[in-house]
């Protein structure tokens, strides 16, 4: 059977309309995931054991269960407890950001632990407050070291965002499926969707390498 894009080409603008939703989901989820990931990483390196246990348990749960399960619990399960339906967009953001935070926290923790311990000891000896030490000394160095890993997590988040199609959110993937249903040809719209995601990943990869080169030039 030959590929025939004649019926799919008119559907491309419809598929591209889902790009705005995809990008909004990724950007909002990435920001929330990064903030929560920083908090979790600080809990993991703290000396207060309950914080360590909570952060490790959180990471274990969200890394040890499928993202699609987490999304379906948020969208289909939580309303059963809360008594009201959660908006599709925010259900997607909650699930993706909570999942991403688990991975980001491990990346940041590793970045902080890779910094020479002598710097932390010197800051403590000089009486630098913990918050100021983290904000001005350790976190900037950690982010400099882990920027490639953070970009990789953003790329993963971009690709995983396609999973929101299971709750009917009109992203690129969902619209590609709808275009296939309208034309009775599913492969061609899915190829178009694949190309869109591929271009997004290429752009993020280019940005990540540019940032990495910039950071190296500042060393």
From Swiss-Prot:
GO terms for cellular component: ATP-binding cassette (ABC) transporter complex; plasma membrane. Residues 19-208 form the ABC transmembrane type-1 domain. CDD domains: TM_PBP2. Keywords: Amino-acid transport, Cell membrane, Membrane, Transmembrane, Transmembrane helix, Transport. It holds the Pfam family BPD_transp_1. It is a multi-pass membrane protein. It is found in: Cell membrane. The chain crosses the membrane at residues 19-39, 51-73, 88-108, 149-169, 187-207. Disruption phenotype: Cells show impaired growth on arginine as the nitrogen source. One of its GO terms (biological process) is amino acid transport. GO terms for molecular function: transmembrane transporter activity. Part of a binding-protein-dependent transport system for arginine. Probably responsible for the translocation of the substrate across the membrane. Belongs to the binding-protein-dependent transport system permease family. HisMQ subfamily. This is Arginine transport system permease protein ArtQ.
């Amino acid at each position: 059977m030959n590929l025939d894009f004649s019926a799919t080409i008119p559907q491309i603008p419809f598929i591209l309309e889902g790009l705005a939703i995809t990008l909004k989901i990724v950007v909002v989820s990435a920001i929330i995931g990064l903030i929560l990931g920083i908090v979790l990483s600080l809990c993991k390196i703290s000396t207060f054991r309950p914080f360590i246990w909570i952060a490790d348990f959180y990471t274990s749960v969200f890394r040890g269960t499928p993202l699609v399960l987490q999304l379906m619990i948020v969208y289909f399960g939580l309303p059963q407890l809360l008594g009201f339906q959660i908006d599709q967009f925010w259900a997607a953001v909650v699930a993706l950001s909570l999942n991403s935070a688990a991975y980001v926290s491990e990346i940041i923790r590793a970045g902080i632990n890779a910094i020479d311990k002598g710097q932390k000891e010197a800051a403590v000896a000089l009486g630098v407050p913990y918050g100021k030490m983290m904000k001005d000394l350790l976190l900037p160095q950690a982010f400099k070291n882990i920027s490639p890993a953070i970009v990789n997590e953003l790329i993963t988040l971009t690709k995983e965002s396609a999973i929101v199609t299971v709750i009917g959110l009109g992203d690129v993937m969902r619209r590609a499926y709808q275009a296939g249903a309208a034309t009775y040809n599913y492969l061609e719209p899915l190829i178009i969707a694949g190309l869109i995601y591929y271009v997004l990943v290429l752009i993020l990869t280019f940005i990540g390498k540019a940032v990495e080169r910039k950071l190296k030039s500042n060393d």
